[in-house]
Amino acid sequence: MKKRIGKRTIRLNNMPTIVAASSIVGPKEGQGPLKDKFDLVISDDLYGEKTWELAESKMVQTALEMSVKKVNKNLEDVDFLFAGDLINQLFPASFAARELGIPFFGIYGACSTMTEGMCLGSMAIDGEYAEYVLCGASSHYCTAERQFRFPLELGNQKPMTAQWTVTGAGSVLLTKEGEGPKIKYIIPGKVIDKGIDDGNNMGAAMAPAAIDTIYSYFDDTKDDPDSFDLIATGDLGKVGKQIVIELLQEKNLDISKVYTDCGLEIFNLEEQDVHCGGSGCGCSATVFASYIYEKLIKKEFNKVMLVSTGALLSPTSTLQKQTIPSVAHGVVIVNE
């Protein structure tokens, strides 16, 4: 069967099964509406380590190990690890990989990293290059603030369009056989830049990339949005979500009945001071590996599209007054 459908969508003939998923979050996330869904809520942001970066590395390592243990496998059984984060040189993911001893592909897609890894891992299994693949992503409020914004000690105020970086790590274990939801389609994202240069308005910067990926899937497959139980973007927040709904409607595509954003699911915007919602690699990673995956396992959801969204700015690009390019990778997951 032909694997490429239209210009962007790839159908996986040997659909990888997501046999396990694991999530770890920080204290603030553990006070949100999904608090009972996570595998572990850590009691403080340092997680017993000396630095926030080491804490983040420990979180993603633990989440990856959890997924392997859940199906009674060993790390030696895993063929590839695709993982990444927001920090320079992928410090958290690389140092976790150092401890795991699995062939490691370090990936950077900003906050799109989770579905980027799932796309690549799925192709590895579909192409019969691997039997077991781990995918993971993490972020940490304190590490991201220090790298991309300001030292926490300054106490800078943020506009209401800003979002709160999730402290969390999520992982999934993919395999060519087994029981569980399967990845049927992947939609690799293009880099889109509509000229937004405000680092405190990431939702507006990333929404065009999500729109491009979601629209490409429906244009390629002629699928019906109402056939989905859920379409979830990664971390567009309140502002970005509304942009996606309105601009897709202008293209005669209405996903509003089944659409949510992981950045709105992980926090209670009325009770927690997170402004526009959650963000970070860990946002879509933890929401998928907890709430969404549980719904798929229980077959309360049978068809889900996850589109993690990433803003590809850097401290250097910001200082050089560049606009913010963004990317969004999509996966369609089904129970069949």
Residue ranges with predicted function:
Residues 90-91, 141-146, 191-195, 313-315:
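Short, well-ordered, mixed-charge alpha-helical segments that flank or form enzyme active sites
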Residues 24, 83-89, 139-140, 179, ...:
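Short glycine-enriched loops at secondary-structure junctions
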Residues 107-135, 174, 279-300:
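Active-site-proximal alpha-helical scaffold in enzymes
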Residues 78, 129-130, 228, 301:
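Short, high-confidence coil segments that cap the C-terminus of an alpha-helix
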Residues 56-72, 120, 205-220, 287-292:
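Short, well-ordered amphipathic alpha-helical segments that serve as non-catalytic structural scaffolds
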Residues 94-97, 236-251, 316-323:
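Short glycine/threonine-rich loop-to-helix capping motif typified by GTGT followed
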